Swiss-Prot record:
Name by which UniProt lists this protein: N-succinylarginine dihydrolase
NCBIfam families hit by this protein: PRK13281.1
GO biological process, one term: arginine catabolic process to succinate
Subunit structure: Homodimer.
Binding site for substrate: 18-27, 100, 127-128, 193, 231, 340
UniProt KW Hydrolase keyword: yes
Record's function text: Catalyzes the hydrolysis of N(2)-succinylarginine into N(2)-succinylornithine, ammonia and CO(2).
HAMAP family on file: AstB (MF_01172)
Pathway: Amino-acid degradation; L-arginine degradation via AST pathway; L-glutamate and succinate from L-arginine: step 2/5
Enzyme class, broadest EC rank: hydrolase
Catalytic activity from the UniProt record: N(2)-succinyl-L-arginine + 2 H2O + 2 H(+) = N(2)-succinyl-L-ornithine + 2 NH4(+) + CO2
This enzyme's EC code(s): 3.5.3.23
Stored SUPFAM superfamilies: Pentein
Length: 415
């Protein structure tokens, strides 16, 4: 039976604040801070536990091998000898944000009846551009069943940032849906990371029906305001689109196109007069997981920052007492990820699949999360300062930490 499974990226032992992500305001504002990898990973595990308790199927991906010595070798250097900016890019733990791992089209949408996944190339940012080989290996292992078709990345220079710029509307996760690809147009101070050509290539690969596939331009105002991915200003679930007024370049045309393709859509729009774009981005209101609850209705799994931003929380409280589709609010603490620019939705990749077709090593239950938390508590560094990235001792420690996790999960082939 098809159901939506959220696969969260386990936050890796090299989690640090190097400020590598241009256009990501949180990342830039925390550059040079001391990170807490152990606390970060435990926060992510607690979010997974929270969603399991809600009755939501939960999976995970393991951290990639970092620092990426082969990538540095291809640049003619090494972890020990690299210039500071290259070393930081090699150490990045950014694969934690699984929403950028791939774009996923469920089987009901594809002409061949398979669930298609295209690994994201992430070419816009150097620190993420070398993620895809490790991510692809993991996707091919987790989704090796014939029910899936896992594709290599779209070729450069066509930038693709995965599911963070992709939404789906449907009457139920197991029903045919309308897929919405959101792209940006270059030209401002901050880069537009999702290219239209990349989105169109993915739609063709995934064998989607053109009549049920939309390409909508992200607002340049949103991009230049710090919404480096669409999931910072909009999120969809089943028949609901939850969006900020400034999310799309031509709001009226976008809404009309969406309604024409999926007439049952409920658009829950937050006006800029109630919640400014700046407050939406600072609180990551829209980088929430909009989920269908087993008992019925929908809920938002939000960062605690949304609760702490009065304009945002006041609007949300007024919304849930109304007669709308979103009825419950669940704040979660992912502050360590938030400080690098990734909220609850960034940390997960949504895959509609029969759990029986997924490699069970990637599916979570309470006992497995206990096992992961035990490895993290024992092996993850408590803190990493920028200067620590030059430490040979830390390098060996984080490698041992990751291998301990792989061993605990019987995933040593990813070593």
């Amino acid at each position: 039976m098809l159901t939506e499974i959220n696969f969260d990226g386990i936050i890796g032992p090299t989690h640090n604040y190097a400020g590598l992500s241009r256009g990501n305001i949180a990342s830039a504002s925390h550059a040079g801070d001391v990170s807490q990898p152990r606390a970060a990973a435990l926060q992510g595990i607690d979010k997974m536990r929270h969603n399991l308790v809600l009755g939501l199927p939960q999976g995970f991906f393991v951290p990639l091998d970092r620092p990426d010595a082969p990538w540095l070798a291809a640049l003619g250097t090494s972890v020990e000898k690299a210039e500071g900016h290259l070393r930081a890019q090699a150490w990045s733990a950014s694969s934690m944000w699984a929403a950028n791992a791939a774009t996923v089209s469920p089987a009901p949408d594809s002409a061949d009846g398979k669930c298609h996944l295209t690994v994201a190339n992430l070419v816009t940012m150097p620190h993420r551009s070398h993620e895809w080989p490790g991510t692809l290996a993991q996707l091919r292992l987790a989704f090796a069943h014939p029910a899936f078709s896992v594709h290599p990345p779209v070729p450069a220079p066509f930038g693709d940032e995965g599911a963070a710029n992709h939404m789906r509307l449907c009457s139920g996760h197991d029903r045919v849906g309308v897929e919405i690809f959101v792209y940006g147009v270059a030209g401002g101070r901050f880069p537009a990371r999702q290219h239209l050509d990349a989105s169109k290539a993915i739609a063709r690969r995934h064998r989607l029906d053109p009549a049920r596939t939309l390409f909508i331009r992200q607002s340049d105002t949103a991009i230049q305001g710090g919404a480096f991915h669409n999931d910072v200003v909009a999120v969809a679930n089943e028949h609901v689109l939850f969006t900020h007024e400034t999310a799309f370049e031509d709001r009226e045309a976008a809404h009309a196109e969406i309604r024409a393709a999926f007439p049952a859509v409920e658009i829950v729009e937050v006006p800029a007069s109630a919640v400014s774009l700046a407050h939406a981005i600072k609180s990551y209101l829209f980088n929430a997981q909009l989920v269908t609850l087993p008992e019925g209705g929908m809920g938002l799994v939000l960062p605690t920052e949304a609760h702490e931003t009065p304009a945002v929380w006041n609007w949300l409280e007024a919304m849930i007492v109304g007669n709308g589709p979103i009825r419950r609010l669940f704040p979660v603490d992912v502050r360590q990820s938030m400080a690098n620019g990734g909220g609850p939705a960034c940390l997960r990749l949504r895959v509609v699949a029969d759990p029986a077709t997924v490699d069970p090593r990637f599916l979570a239950d309470e006992a497995k999360l206990d096992r992961i938390a035990g490895v993290v508590a024992k092996h993850w560094p408590e803190a990493i300062a920028p200067a620590d990235l030059a430490s040979t001792t830390l390098l060996h420690d984080v490698r041992r930490a990751r291998l301990a996790l792989l061993d605990a999960l019987d995933l040593s082939e990813l070593g």
